[in-house]
Amino acid sequence: MPKNKGKGGKNRRRGKNENESEKRELVFKEDGQEYAQVIKMLGNGRLEAMCFDGVRRLCHIRGKLRKKVWINTSDIILIGLRDYQDNKADVILKYNADEARSLKAYGELPEHAKINETDTFGPGDDDEIQFDDIGDDDEDIDDI
């Protein structure tokens, strides 16, 4: 068998993600663009989004964003509308939570828009289930 003479796999080629710390300029919508919130990921580079103009559209993630920008449900995205198809659109940009909050503050997003917060919601909002102890199970076990 031949010796491995390479310098690593595909993760080495990817390099370090240095864009995370970089603040980018806030991009507002232009003509032919709309803000939307992801409802459902469909796979194959497609998703279903509810636009803030009230229309539900099937969106295609363009090649520049594929495998680089991960989009999840309830993310705020900027989509480019198609002239020839009203019910389909292309994803141009994904806003992170801070950018979405500032868009809401500028009045670009409606007030009812839910932004996917990653903050902790404080005490009492745990996903724990509380059970009440109402049975006399101890007596039944002793009788056996």
From Swiss-Prot:
This is Eukaryotic translation initiation factor 1A. GO terms for molecular function: ribosomal large subunit binding; translation initiation factor activity; tRNA binding. One of its GO terms (biological process) is translational initiation. Residues 124-144 have a biased composition (Acidic residues). Component of the 43S pre-initiation complex (43S PIC), which binds to the mRNA cap-proximal region, scans mRNA 5'-untranslated region, and locates the initiation codon. This protein enhances formation of the cap-proximal complex. Together with EIF1, facilitates scanning, start codon recognition, promotion of the assembly of 48S complex at the initiation codon (43S PIC becomes 48S PIC after the start codon is reached), and dissociation of aberrant complexes. Residues 16-26 have a biased composition (Basic and acidic residues). The lineage of its organism: Eukaryota, Metazoa, Chordata, Craniata, Vertebrata. Belongs to the eIF-1A family. It holds the Pfam family eIF-1a.
